[in-house]
């Protein structure tokens, strides 16, 4: 147990979320509990992780979640480990919710995306159809998030573009999407900023250098007979420059997103085109999507991201990287246990709002923990 590597999870504590400040001590080695000397609260070592209040051995949980993240059927896990099916599904739900928190904390941070590709997957559920829309950063192969909705409409596209908006800096950005017209309106409405002005509602100004291109496939008898590439917003020269920067040139395409769709189809049984493993509820599919996507970002080496290391005598070694390493989020490949044990810090403490001047004790807390 290392008190210098943990933080207080109590949101009402002035020291919440701060590491290495000397406010955390070991409360019980036997029970694996820490104590915050500022608020006086104690908390377990596994607080805010997937393993919190689980009675099963951690290694078993890690193995089961790893199998779920790589497409192993739940029935096979039940037979192999002698677990209850409801237990396995609860671990999947808990892991998916935890991975979504990790994704929102680490991935949804402003960065120069360069080129983003988006696409949807038609998912057959038990008795109805849903759509799973996802996006990827081409340069680093980073999965930017996804949204599940019963309808393939403007609300689905806007929710996805809001996810992408949280990950983007105001830089030149190219969107490559399919022929769905809802994408164009969703991109234009998501990437706007309010401009302060006179009294009244501020005017929304679109971002500069937002480029939109569409790839429309033409079908005949369920076969692709042609591809039409359209420039919706921007110039051909601007798009060619971003294509050269992010993918080394080439034509307008959505191949990277389609390859990621194939990865998700191989790891989530409900996404198989013709199969019997149909999902029943949308939250189950949503949690599985975030589990697979976060494991893909942080725990999976991507062959196209490796870098050559040249050695003497004309020798060469390859430096393997995950999408999170390529994006600068982390410096090493995470294990599944490290991902499930990651603790998302709470929001920064805010001093209480009271009438009058703050007391000297409140001023001391603000000076110590808010500066």
Where do the protein language model's features map onto the residues?
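Residue-level recognition of single "structural anchor" positions
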Residues: 1-371
């Amino acid at each position: 147990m290392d008190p210098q590597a943990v933080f207080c999870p109590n949101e009402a504590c002035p020291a919440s979320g701060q590491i290495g400040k000397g406010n955390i001590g070991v409360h019980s080695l036997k029970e694996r509990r820490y104590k915050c000397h500022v608020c006086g609260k104690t908390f377990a070592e596994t607080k805010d992780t997937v393993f919190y209040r689980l009675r099963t051995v951690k290694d078993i949980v890690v193995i089961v979640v790893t199998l779920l993240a790589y497409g192993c059927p739940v029935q096979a896990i039940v037979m192999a480990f002698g677990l209850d099916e409801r237990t396995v599904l609860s671990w999947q739900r808990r892991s998916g919710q935890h991975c979504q928190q990790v994704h929102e904390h680490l991935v949804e941070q402003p960065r120069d995306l360069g080129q983003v590709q988006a696409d949807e997957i038609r998912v057959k559920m038990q008795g109805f159809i849903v759509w799973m829309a996802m996006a990827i950063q081409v340069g680093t192969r980073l999965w930017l998030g996804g949204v599940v909705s019963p309808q393939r409409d403007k609300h689905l596209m806007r929710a996805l573009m809001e996810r992408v908006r949280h990950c983007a800096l105001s830089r030149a950005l190219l969107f490559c999407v399919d022929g769905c017209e809802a994408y164009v309106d969703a991109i234009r409405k998501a990437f706007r900023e309010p401009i302060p002005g006179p009294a009244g509602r501020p005017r929304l100004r679109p971002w500069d250098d937002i480029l939109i291109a569409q790839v429309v496939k033409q079908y005949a008898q369920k076969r692709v007979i042609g591809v039409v590439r359209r420039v919706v917003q921007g110039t051909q020269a601007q798009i060619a420059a971003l294509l050269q920067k992010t993918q080394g040139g080439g034509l307008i395409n959505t191949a990277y997103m389609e390859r990621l769709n194939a990865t998700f189809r191989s790891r989530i049984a409900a996404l198989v085109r013709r199969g019997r493993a149909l999902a029943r509820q949308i939250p189950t599919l949503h949690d599985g999507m975030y589990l697979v996507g976060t494991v893909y970002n942080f725990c999976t080496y991507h062959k196209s991201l490796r870098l050559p290391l040249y050695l003497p005598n004309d020798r060469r070694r390859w430096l393997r990287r995950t999408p999170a390493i390529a994006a600068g989020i982390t410096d090493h490949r995470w294990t599944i246990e490290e991902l499930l044990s990651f603790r998302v810090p709470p929001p920064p403490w805010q001093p209480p709002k009271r009438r009058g001047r703050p007391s000297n004790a409140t001023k001391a807390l603000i000076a110590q923990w808010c500066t």
